[in-house]
From Swiss-Prot:
Protein role: Component of the COP9 signalosome (CSN) complex that acts as an regulator of the ubiquitin (Ubl) conjugation pathway by mediating the deneddylation of the cullin subunit of SCF-type E3 ubiquitin-protein ligase complexes. The CSN complex is involved in the regulation of the mating pheromone response.
Keyword Transferase (UniProt): no
Gene Ontology cellular component terms for the protein in this record: COP9 signalosome; cytoplasm
Keywords: Cytoplasm, Nucleus, Signalosome
Compartments it resides in: Cytoplasm; Nucleus
InterPro entries noted in UniProt: PCI_dom
Subunit structure: Component of a COP9 signalosome-like (CSN) complex.
Protein name, as recorded: COP9 signalosome complex subunit 10
Domain of life: Eukaryota
Coiled coil: none
Ranges of Acidic residues composition bias in the record: 1-33
Region of interest called Disordered, as start-end residue ranges on this chain: 1-37, 573-594
Amino acid sequence: MTDESDNYNDFMMSDEDMDSIEMEDEENDVEGDEGQRGGQEWVQNYEQGLSLWNDENYVAARQVFLKTLSMLVSEEELIEMRCKIHRQVLECWCKILMYGEPDNEQSTEIIADFRNFVELVNELHGKANCSLDLSSMFHHVTMDFMPNIYDRTFIPGITDDEESSKWAKMTFKTTILQILQGSWVCHTFPEVGLLLQQELHVLQAWIKTFDKERDLYAISESLRKDINTLNELQLILQCYIARYIEDQHLLCNEGEVFRMCLNQLDQKCNESLAVAQRSDINLILHFSKALFLILFELDQDDLGDGNKVTGSTCVRRFVTIHKFYQNIECCKEEFWECLKNLEELGTNKFRFERFMQIIVGGFVLCAMIMHRGSQTRLAGTSGNADINPFDYEQLRIAPDHIFVDKLRRIYDVFVGLQIQEMHSCLIELECIRAPLSRLFDQVCYLIQKRKLFSEIAPIYSCISIQDLRQKLQIDPSVPPTRDEILVHLMRYCMQDRGINFKLDLVADTVTFYSEQHSEPLHDAVFSETRMGHKSHKSSISKDRAIVEDIKAAHEMPEVEYAHDIGILESQVDSQSHSKSNTKSMSRHVSGHDPDSFGQDTISFFDTLRLARETYQGSNIDNSVYTIAKLTNEALQEISNDVR
């Protein structure tokens, strides 16, 4: 019953009572220490330093702690207490450096304090009954001293003004880590030595990135052999980003390493809420994902037939059109996340001018590719593909208004299919054209394709390829080649679109058919020609029956069958010529004159060959059915007589 009443009294105790009890306990502890240590004055100074520390007055607290240490210099039995106080001095420096960079005088004092700390720790080496956890102490000092050294430090976004200060800061902290490595603790406790070695390795790699003749490939190669820490992942991904922005070059065999680093950083963000909430890490992660999609998931021929290349040594591959638009949408989302991370970091345009331009440009280009990417929304893609990207707040309040206006102009040109204005827009965006060349190439391809089939095809029933080259010309000095025009046509044909066309590679012409003629070509021509022959139906009824028999026998429409053997002639008078040749052939066949039969047969097929080679698709007239009838009649007679 006594225990229950005591618990009840403790539960009902007020906060003031608890504070008074804690103060009494602290006073008892201090009185015990004073009684044990002879009531020395250093205890009061130490308590004063702790009070200043709690008040976040770290400069004054450090001075008091140093004064306390000077009182204990001759106290060999209190060497462990001296280590504790010395650690408090270093903790004060860590807090001070969080709010600014050290000047030359402070740097000298910090180095001296760290040297004294290491010497004091070395004095404890071999001492029995040491109650200090030196391994934990070194670990905390290192981790408390290193935070924020990499925050807001981006290789692609660092300016010349920041470069010298960042270099000095990292060089200074490298010196500190080298001092800590001189302690016996690093050799006795492997985990401490490994931690210091990893941090030192990353710092030295960072210092190399500030060199004007830096080799980012060598830096990334030295880091990727043993990736253990978050800082190493950050740096190696930044090396990839900086290398691509500078020279747009990454080796094919680096794709898997890039993917591995991305997966590891993504996993760390998923496992740790503290890491996931860091905007600088998220910026690197999302930009790296967008870069990986552009480099290794998109290809110049992604809007082609969708065939895949197997057995390639490169990670790049052809993808289907459906997969292509999914990748573009993912790339757009990654750039969008980068914009939000930049907003959270509060960066100004002078520090991240080039980096931000690439992010904003990539976002707008992906939106352009997704705009009217298909007549119906592709499965697996969002329904906001046609939302104007400049309606987003991040672009409306972007600090670089001039650059955003340039992007707005190319967006309007693309949507309006103003292909003649595209070249000047590309020149204005030359600053980001190299790193985003793959997206620019896709934009140029799409505006040509949509111009061809949205504005040219509905207007022109027949147009030459040379005229198409002029109408689809982006660069005034370099028109598209004939092969490029044919590639546009063949890809469109393979995608099973609504507009049908007929390609004449001899005359280099393209004949377009409207959407209502989406049925096969021979059916459309058959219906049109039949209407033209309606007035002559009575005169050719017998011939028509023969042609229908041939059509049924060969399971082909008459026009298609005639075209298959190449007899579509443009001259009306060729009808009588073909008829006389047919009768001549029939007479020789019936008379069984082998020589005459062979000569006339050769002459007949020479005529067919000549007709095919000189055929002009735009001059097809009503004589086609008579020609088809006469030719097939002659072939039928030849076949019967030979049997």
